[in-house]
Amino acid sequence: NDMRYRSNFGFIHTSGNLFLCRKYLGASGIYGEKIPLIRLAEMYYILAESVALSECGQYINAVKNARGISRAYDVGTDVTEEQRLEELNKEYQKEFFAEGQYFYFLKRHNMKTFYRCPVENFSAYVLPVPDDEKTYGEAE
């Protein structure tokens, strides 16, 4: 019953090799032209990452319940750090589909891969330090 699956997921094939993400289709006015800088769900997830393990469930559950997920799937108060990251990992994938935020979550937690990852490790995403930064900056 997760409302994110009904509206966000999937791509629409238009012509040739062009695919459009359904998440952003159909919005009109300013909502069709802008993507929010930060969303309430992201703030809740940041809180869930930073508070004590016994408190993280209330923030994750607030988002899950607002998305129509049954309270039977709520995160309890007796979670481990691994369980917290696993739950946040699942929620980031659903909440920030096609936005790029999930990539930063993976980098922040030094997670190397995800299901069907097209790149073996994230070293492919590390850009070299610019020469000016080596010459004039503090980089080595």
Where is each model-derived feature located?
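Acidic/polar-rich alpha-helix caps and helix-coil junctions
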Residues: 1-140
